[in-house]
Regions:
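Non-catalytic signal-transmission and effector/linker regions of two-component phosphorelay proteins
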Residues: 1-9, 15-16, 22, 73, ...
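Two-component/phosphorelay signaling modules centered on CheY-like receiver
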Residues: 15-33
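Acidic, metal-coordinating helix/loop segments flanking the phosphotransfer/catalytic sites
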Residues: 34-52
């Protein structure tokens, strides 16, 4: 069984984002599950073991904020990092109010995400 702190869930409807994040995080020794949307994440039986959920804000079938609301009920306390191409003050404030640990703007050009996940999961 994976160490809860080191299980990272990635949810984004952009396959290139999922693939690149999965590759980078696995290089760091983290266990990573990827999903193409909120429904797929919520159906993953190992969600209750996740130390961190990285999610996009503008996914087609279930946007990131709707997913956050569901996660707060089903998995309270799981750390979330939101990825957005539109990091406006309004989006940041809404994410903060929803309990997001951090908002990062795409494209991710440095190791900020990896460093943040390391802080969350203790890796």
């Amino acid at each position: 069984m994976a160490d809860r702190r080191k299980l990272v869930m990635i949810v984004d409807d952009d396959q290139a984002v999922r693939d690149s994040l999965q590759f980078a995080l696995r290089l760091e020794g983290l266990c990573v599950h990827v999903h193409n949307g909120g429904a797929a994440l919520l159906a993953d039986p190992s969600l209750n073991r996740a130390g961190c959920v990285v999610l996009g804000d503008r996914m087609r079938q279930m946007d990131g904020f709707t997913l956050l609301n569901t996660l707060q009920t089903s998995n309270p306390g799981v750390a979330t990092i939101m990825l957005t191409s539109h990091a406006t003050p309004r989006v940041r404030a809404r994410a903060e109010a929803a309990g997001v640990w951090k908002v990062l703007e795409k494209p991710l050009l440095d190791n900020a995400l990896v460093d943040d996940i390391r802080s969350i999961v203790g890796a």
